[in-house]
Amino acid sequence: MGYGWAGILRKYVVEPAHMWWPSTLVQISLFTTLHEKEEKKDGKRPIARVKFFVIALVCSFCWYVFPGYLFQTLQSISLACLVFPHSVTAHQVGSGMNGLGIGAFTLDWTTVASFLFSPLVSPFFAIVNVFIGYALIIYLVMPVSYWGLNLFNAKTFPIYSSDLFTAQGQEYNVSLIVNKKFEIDFPEYEKLGRVHMSTFFAITYGFGFATIAATVTHVALFYGREIYSRYQASSREKPDVHTRLMRNYKDIPSWWFYLLLAVSILLGLVLCIFFKKDVQMPWWGLLFAAALAFFFTLPISIITATTNQTPGLNIITEYIMGAILPGQPITNVCFKTYGYISMAQAVAFLSDFKLGHYMKIPPRSMFLVQFIGTMLAGTINLGVGWWLLSSVENICHKDLLPANSPWTCPGDKVFFDASVIWGLVGPKRIFGSLGEYSTLNWFFLGGLLGPVVVWLLHKAFP
C-alpha cells in the first residue's frame, strides 16, 4: 500500500526543490565521488576519490573490530560508573546502557548513528532541535520526575527500562493474563493487577503523543498554503531544473500506483475475511488503517524531506485500535502493521524517487527496481527470520541466553510490550480512567499548541 501512497503524493514531496531530502544527498555525494572523472588542479592531481574512499573504508572496518567484538565496553564508556562502580545512583545517572547516560560517551560510530541515523546527514537546525529535546528530557524532566516527584511511583521501577512491571516492581508475567485465543483473561488480570512501566518509558510515550500531534499542526501552519496551491494548480507552477530534465523521460502512469494499491488492499481484505481466525482484524479495520496511513503520509514525508527526522505512526495506530477493540493484541498488531508500516514504506519509496530525481534515473526504471527489490527482500527476510527462529535456541529469551548473546531482540521486545500495553490490556486500563498514566494524554494538547507558538515567533521574527 505504501507504493500507492507514494505515487499519489509525488508531486508534493518529490518535485518541489525545497523538499530536498537530506539523506539522499549523502548517497548522491558517494555516487558522484565514485563515478565522476577528476581534474587536475594547478598541475597536481590530488588523492583519488576512490582511493580515499577505500582507505576510509578499510580504517573504519579495522576500528570496528575493537568496539564491535574485542572490547565492547568502547560502545558506551560511563565516567560516573568508572568513578563510583558500586553506586546505584551513579549507574542510574551515568550508564549509557541502563541509565540516563549523563557524562557517558562512545567510541563506536554505529552507536552514534543507530537510532537517529548519522548526525552528519541532518541539517544543523534539526540537530539543534533534537539536542534541545534530548537535554530537556534527560537533564530536566527525568531527574525531576524520578528523584524529585517520584512520578508514577518511579523509584519502584528501574529508571530506564522498556519492560512491564507489577505494582511491587516485579516483572509482569504476561502469559498469566492471556487465554487460548490470545485475548485478555480478565479474572487473571484482576489477580495480577495493573501493568506498570518505568517512568522513562511512560514519558517516552507522552512525548510520542506530542510528536504526532505536533506533526499535523506544524505541516498545516508552515506548509498548508503551499500544499493547497499545488493541489489547485500544480501544472501551472514553474518547475525547477531537476523537474524539467526529468520530463525528458516517460513518467509512470498513475494507474500503476492505483492498481498496486487496489491489489494490496484487496489481498488484505482477503486475509481479514477468509483468515479471520488468524488475523483477528475486521475488514473495516484494514480500510481504517489505510485511511490513517494516507492521512499521515504527507505531513510525515514533508518533515522527513526537510529535517531528515521521521516521526513514527506506531503509537497513534496502537492507541486508536486499542481503544476500539481492547483485549485483542493480534488485532492491534495487524492494525499497526497496515497503518504504520505502509506509511513508513511510502516515505522510503518517496525518498528513493527523490534520489532518482536528482540522479536523472528514468521513473519507470526506478519503480520497477523498487517493486522487484521489495518482493525479493520481503521473501528473503521472511525466510531468514523463520530460519533464525528454528535454529537459534532460546532466541529473544534474554534470561535463557548466554551472557553477551547478540540474539536478545530488544526491538522485538519493545514491539511485544507495546502489543500488551495497547492491544492486550488496552489504553483505557493504562492511559485512561482505569490506568495510572491518564495525565500523559495532555501531551496531545501540548503537541498541538507547540508549533503554534513557534509559528507565531516565526511570523514576528522572520
Predicted feature residues:
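Alpha-helical multipass membrane-protein architecture
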Residues: M1-P462
